[in-house]
Amino acid sequence: MASLLQSDRVVYLVQGEKKVRAPLSQLYFCRYCSELRSLECVSHEVDSHYCPSCLENMPSAEAKLKKNRCANCFDCPGCMHTLSTRATSISTQLPDDPAKTTMKKAYYLACGFCRWTSRDVGMADKSVASGGWQEPENPHTQRMNKLIEYYQQLAQKEKVERDRKKLARRRNYMPLAFSDKYGLGTRLQRPRAGASISTLAGLSLKEGEDQKEIKIEPAQAVDEVEPLPEDYYTRPVNLTEVTTLQQRLLQPDFQPVCASQLYPRHKHLLIKRSLRCRKCEHNLSKPEFNPTSIKFKIQQVAVNYIPEVRIMSIPNLRYMKESQVLLTLTNPVENLTHVTLLECEEGDPDNTNSTAKVVVPPKELVLAGKDAAAEYDELAEPQDFQDDPDIIAFRKANKVGIFIKVTPQREEGEVTVCFKMKHDFKNLAAPIRPIEESDQGTEVIWLTQHVELSLGPLLP
């Protein structure tokens, strides 16, 4: 029964740009293409940026300007948890009478997990609770900004040269004399969309502005390297004061060696993204814009459209001995679904991981529609499907248990079974053309899924 909850032991094959095998819970279903989609078959679009701590959302331009970090929230440099602002009272001298003191509120950053505080690295307390925390400056910031500006200008120059070469290939194949003779010169001189070759002759980076060329100084190698201190190899090392590799990599601009050099970092922003089918460009997933909302405007996950196969019980599997495995089929839609299991044909290019022979039920299986109210109604009369007890183990609501026979073909290793699942699907997506009176309201199509089961190791 433990295998019933291990949904990753049953994978479905996605026939996309690259063949992907994944559990049904990790896949999407495009109702317009009527095909499964994985995360590698969809386009990812960023909808909004937000801070996971204060839940403040911001547009993409502002997030890019802030380097995808929140201005008010910080991460602990020691354990990477969110820092909280603590308030304390300190005594300060009055400006009028230095002999007298008064109590004043001060704020500092503290971590509730590793007990790190901003006072450990000598950061001054603030008189306000939010903002105003000073950050250490990187000595190489000016050099990096200069290099970025230089390469941006260089990339813009190369783009202008490419555009000039493309438009230079466009030639007027009609001779000028022929054009002037029949009065076509004025017609050909009408303004066209885009820039002409003559206008590109004096094309610059910024039209109407003189942009100075940025020059950078090349990096120079240093002949002499600063030697290590004399006591570098002899002084004792206190491991509590040495930073870990993860702590150094989280601050690549400083890479602190000692714990006294650890400064808080602004918290990284998270995104809400939409997923779009690359084939038909329809949305498969679109969340709400509000960061506090966990709802979706569109969420076409495969478990809501494709019958789900799960392993309920696995007997002891032995080499070349037939065993009976109990599977469950779940119908996620509200209407009846007809399912037919088929064995993979010889030479099937998708059947590459199979290590056992499988015998599936030859008859068509009928799954009842999903009804949340009837699932908890014990007095409801069950529907009579005239099930064969040799094939159907049990039936409850929209679930049915079936038997398949497995014969391992290898003496060692994991046992993997592959088969095809053919089922009908009523496409409820909006049709492209209006439905005529003679047409039916919903179109029934038949889909075939390639399913692989991992049944575990063989017994000796």
Curated annotation (Swiss-Prot):
Residue positions where Phosphoserine is found in the record: S196
Main location class: cytoplasm
Numbered residues of crosslink Glycyl lysine isopeptide (Lys-Gly) (interchain with G-Cter in SUMO2): K215
Residues modified as N-acetylalanine: A2
Cited InterPro entries: DCTN4
Coiled-coil regions, chain positions: 152-172
Keyword check for Cytoplasm: yes
A Gene Ontology cellular-component term: dynactin complex
Sorted UniProt keywords: Acetylation, Coiled coil, Cytoplasm, Cytoskeleton, Isopeptide bond, Phosphoprotein, Ubl conjugation
UniProt record similarity statement: Belongs to the dynactin subunit 4 family.
Protein name per UniProt: Dynactin subunit 4
